[in-house]
């Protein structure tokens, strides 16, 4: 049995030299932002600053607030990593990554700026006409009217009275509390759970199915492999380094997206990627955009660039090549799958008269037929790992992508072999890093013990809608849609409560969202900064950043390598409060504080989470330090046994599919699904199928809108988080979100790096700063996801966004009736040079405020 002293030894043994220089003071983030490479232990992942980017303009001030805390060094954490916060004179001076972080994030100094951000929500605020008229003010003025500062008591009274009014008049189903978003790290300060805890005590709310990240894949994969596939531990990187003979990164860029974790991270994937690189494993990156990971693997990585949205056609053609050349692993197909005959009949053209040959696919995807054939044979002949990303399924008919990946891997026969098969979470939260022996750390639940006024949080009145369809729901109450084999009728949403998220960055078709957002009677937002979502709210509640409160979190969503004490570094700035304080006070107003708190304060809850985990660890033979020891040290790390380092995804299934069946109806991989066939959906057949999207490079409308738009993840942000910090602002061009464009396309349009372009789709237009690069197909452009919406005309639909918010351009239709996922990457645009005057970016400064009597 390991004792607590052994655990501290584990922590010491895990320590490696920090790979970044000592961080500078928060206000001098200019130098940190200039760093153009991310240093991994033993190697470098290239993140080049592309030509045309401007020097950082510190035109916005990040004033340091006041604090009563003295000089100190405290431990804290965020989605970007674990760090020591240096406080001097009550102000954050810098953040230093912990010495055992394998690849410290470049964003730490941006995090240090968060409490002092120019866009910080400083006080409780209410839209002027709403303060005067309440819900009768209507939604017309949202996004354009000034705000009035109010007291916390007034703001919470308004929220409490509205929650009660809407519940009593329309029922709790009329309150939308899905509140999707990444929030801040921390198991207590979970903004969404705390908010939903209050809503549940109030009788319930309408929630959502799924998420934006994996809307299609997480619905289709349970039919195919019996589990969601996208949020599961992956075959260990160590196994890949030893056994994998070909790594195929299809639409994935683990160097960018593994900078963050749903909890916190010490970037273990960096070590895994280094092992794979040193082992000399050949890598193929399939992506219209050359990923940073391809730069990391260098000459050992080949880049194949299909047209966006055509991956399924390319994979089906690979299946045709394997079948007609006699290379399919028929023993694997026979033993571990069902439905192959019906699928291959479609591939060979027996169903529709069209053989899905590599030559057929070349006309669709733009990849040469010979290259498609070669890739098919390489994947069959070598033990290959198909590392699938998520952006490729954020598209119309996106369900087909990961289904077809599984089928292709099955035809190659490597599923369940060490280092082979498929993995759909290597690029997320450091999937593939070995899992420790420690128990999962608990957190605050959205489901409290009791209800209020006889109303339980469980009830038939509650509704759930697909997340990406909430705009459609707001606009069309009573409408019935298909979803995953059932019918859903939209409720009539009268109140929206969003906490710790930014739907104006997440939801497609911003102009459609503006129209929908104005329909409910009341909108409430609780956040730390003035996102567009907050600017379009009636009531705005200022929350603390994670540097201004206490919390606890675990290290690694999959690895669970340790726990971190998130110690308060500075006092809450202005009149912000912790999310727990906000919702405790709201519950007090509503008469159920006791049920909300269960008699515990913030440190009481944190202690409960830790000590419950310690009890479970003890049962499993692991002795954790006392809570007092843990909190004083700031963290504890856990051992990883050898079995975890040898983990092989679906290995048990391959060894014995009868004893270890999958969770599908057949217990096997379902290439053809009878269940999906029974739904009779016209947009999601019963086996993987190529279907043309409404918008793609092969559509008629591409004559007017000739560029496919990719909305890839930014290395400078987590979705829209950190958009107003110096690190992200440095990446901008002329203060605009960049648009990446190929040199050939730029030449035809008369564009060069450093110019500003107007990018237009059928939904709207944005301004973006031009970066010319050969890392993108000539017929494709990239505007990275998450730039804040900054309209030319406040609150108006259809106005020009002058900052480069990608979702102004994207289309808002369901991927199919099966998952109703979002389709952000099924968008066509046109581009023209912008020579007119440039409007200032207002998204990163305070909104207009007035006095109540003005």
Label every model-predicted segment.
Residues 2-327, 368, 586, 747, ...:
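N-terminal export/assembly segments and adjacent metallocofactor-ligating motifs
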Residues 130-154, 327-367, 569-666, 670, ...:
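N-terminal leader/propeptide and maturation segments of large enzyme subunits in energy/redox metabolism
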Residues 190-275, 279-286, 293, 313-316, ...:
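Extended redox/cofactor-interaction regions of prokaryotic respiratory oxidoreductases
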Residues 207, 328-331, 372-373, 385-386, ...:
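Acidic/polar loop patches that form or flank catalytic/metal-binding clefts of enzymes
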Residues 299-305, 561-572:
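Short beta-alpha connecting loops at secondary-structure transitions
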Residues 318, 339-469:
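Active-site phosphate/pyrophosphate-binding segments
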Residues 531, 544-568, 779:
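Catalytic or ion-translocation cores adjacent to nucleophile or general acid/base/metal-coordination motifs
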Residues 573, 578-633, 720, 726-740, ...:
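Long, contiguous, secondary-structure-rich segments that constitute the structural scaffold
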